[in-house]
Amino acid sequence: MGDRGGAGSSRRRRTGSRVSVQGGSGPKVEEDEVRDAAVSPDLGAGGDAPAPAPAPAHTRDKDGRTSVGDGYWDLRCHRLQDSLFSSDSGFSNYRGILNWCVVMLILSNARLFLENLIKYGILVDPIQVVSLFLKDPYSWPAPCVIIASNIFVVAAFQIEKRLAVGALTEQMGLLLHVVNLATIICFPAAVALLVESITPVGSVFALASYSIMFLKLYSYRDVNLWCRQRRVKAKAVSTGKKVSGAAAQQAVSYPDNLTYRDLYYFIFAPTLCYELNFPRSPRIRKRFLLRRVLEMLFFTQLQVGLIQQWMVPTIQNSMKPFKDMDYSRIIERLLKLAVPNHLIWLIFFYWFFHSCLNAVAELLQFGDREFYRDWWNAESVTYFWQNWNIPVHKWCIRHFYKPMLRHGSSKWVARTGVFLTSAFFHEYLVSVPLRMFRLWAFTAMMAQVPLAWIVGRFFQGNYGNAAVWVTLIIGQPVAVLMYVHDYYVLNYDAPVGV
């Protein structure tokens, strides 16, 4: 009986072996499962020897898929593995969830858009935008102030010309540059505060233009000073690297760079840092330029529409909770304002740093197009400020941070000095046009110093990135509401909320 059972078992093993050979075209996993099934213990008919379950006959259909023939199903269908959402699984393809988030975002904002239209109607009025720039159609103070900035450009050029030939001493040249740069800061501010016909929006454009001019001429003065110092040491200066061919013939050295053509190219170039030889693109790409111009036009209209249709009603309805000091309503209005404010800020970033600066760079064949880096991946506040506005960051490092380190300042003092400078310009561009000084923008910028330490100390990785996004989404609406509230209190009666 036992011998018969053993013989039967042997025959069954050979049969299982034969099936696995016939199905040899299948994957190795299937062969292992057949082999495991053949040797798995089971009681035979006589109970004196293990009898394996018959292995399934695996075959391939014409499409190459595995099909199961006659026999029992596989005994093993589980293996050691983690759930996909577990960190140990190594799974990282969440594209479908990302698409779901985008769909939910679109649907949520579509509901807000419809709610806004039903509640307020269509508020977009392109003609009204003109009144933001001009009170009197016969008085154009802001454009006149911007045109007058050429006086300071010519003054800086003439100072450098005389320094190059030795007609001025370095001390006298420094004094004249300080006077010129100080006037650049004070002159437009005086116009914005004293001329009644200039509008707040016109003042912002004028002050922004003069602030850019200040940074450019500061860099122009520094680079020419470095060239003179190098010339004194080496008796011959060439700031560019030695190259051969046509590039070598086009390279400019000091003082040959002191021309109006060179200076005005720098004034219009999308950079704040002066060089004697800028990288140049070989040609103007017309299709690329056309795309950027169309983006500029489209996003300009989109920003104006969102401000008129979405932000203005929300801000107006936020005045009464501020007046009544209704904190729960203030928080609700703050969160309601955060969405359109942040969306407009993101659109402005793309419009200015990608569309506008690339369009200007393409026209001037300016080769360095790194106007921003991946600030959206910032895991710290410091990384965000270092990567979202590259022209300003380069200027701060080159003309402020490193000179302070060379003069013996610590890194912490130098960083604080950079934030102080940035805080001054933020307050300058907000308080002067509104003709009120509340220091909200200055305080917000200086608060970035302890905030950077807190985020860097307690938040890492994705949590740090989330903390940066929260400060961007919530922080800006707070400043906007503070200034708008104070401006309405000073100039108008607070409107009653709807």
From Swiss-Prot:
Predominant localisation class: endoplasmic reticulum
Catalytic residues of the enzyme: 426
Disruption of the gene: reported phenotype: Mice are viable and live well, but show substantially reduced levels of triacylglycerides in all tissues. Mice are resistant to obesity when kept on a high-fat diet due to increased energy expenditure: they display reduced postabsorptive chylomicronemia and accumulate neutral-lipid droplets in the cytoplasm of enterocytes. Mice also show increased sensitivity to insulin and to leptin and are protected against insulin resistance. Mutant mice show reduced levels of monoalkyl-monoacylglycerol (MADAG) in the adrenal gland.
Record GO biological process: diacylglycerol metabolic process; fatty acid homeostasis; lipid storage; long-chain fatty-acyl-CoA metabolic process; monoacylglycerol biosynthetic process; retinoid metabolic process; triglyceride biosynthetic process; very-low-density lipoprotein particle assembly
KW Iron (keyword) present: no
Sequence segments annotated as region (Disordered): 1-66
Residue ranges of the region described as MBOAT fold: 140-498
EC number: 2.3.1.20, 2.3.1.76
Record annotation: effect of changing residue 426 to A: Impairs the ability to synthesize triacylglycerols, as well as retinyl and wax esters, in an in vitro acyltransferase assay
Pathway(s) it belongs to: Lipid metabolism; glycerolipid metabolism
Keywords: Acyltransferase, Endoplasmic reticulum, Lipid metabolism, Membrane, Phosphoprotein, Transferase, Transmembrane, Transmembrane helix
Subunit composition and interactions: Homodimer or homotetramer; both forms have similar enzymatic activities.
Protein name: Diacylglycerol O-acyltransferase 1
Species for this entry: Mus musculus (Mouse)
Gene (name only): Dgat1
